[in-house]
Amino acid sequence: MTFYGHEYKAPFECRESFEGMSDGELRSYDAIVVPSAIVSDRLRYSEKLPEPAPAVQFIRRAFAEPGILKGVICHGMWLISPAPELVRGRRVVAHPNLYGDVVNMGAVYTDEDVVVDGDLVTARTGGHCHQFARTIVDLLYERSGEARP
């Protein structure tokens, strides 16, 4: 499946699926990152309402694993919105357009470019992707106990 970016129309190809992933395989991941922009809206689409979309089911499973670092940037919070319990009471940031969504999910909107709340890293916009990525890399090194190169 190929997605195309909204602004620059850059292709993003998905060759693998998270559907049917075993718990052991899921636990083998150090981190998962929810993409920004319209792709997160598309990923939350379900053909069988009220059943949540496969991507939402995957996100719920990933959030249940404290050993997996979760990253959500910008409009990526759209993918979390069908599962508000995942961020309820947690400090997050998202695109300013999603402020109402974040509050309605019960999360604590924090006016910072990047916010870390335990195993969850959120960033305001795609323009903060370098800070977001650096934070995730730093946390992965910290968790591994390895020295940074």
Each language-model region and where it sits:
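Extended, subdomain-level signal for the structured scaffold at the beginning of enzyme domains
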Residues: 1-67, 78-88, 99-149
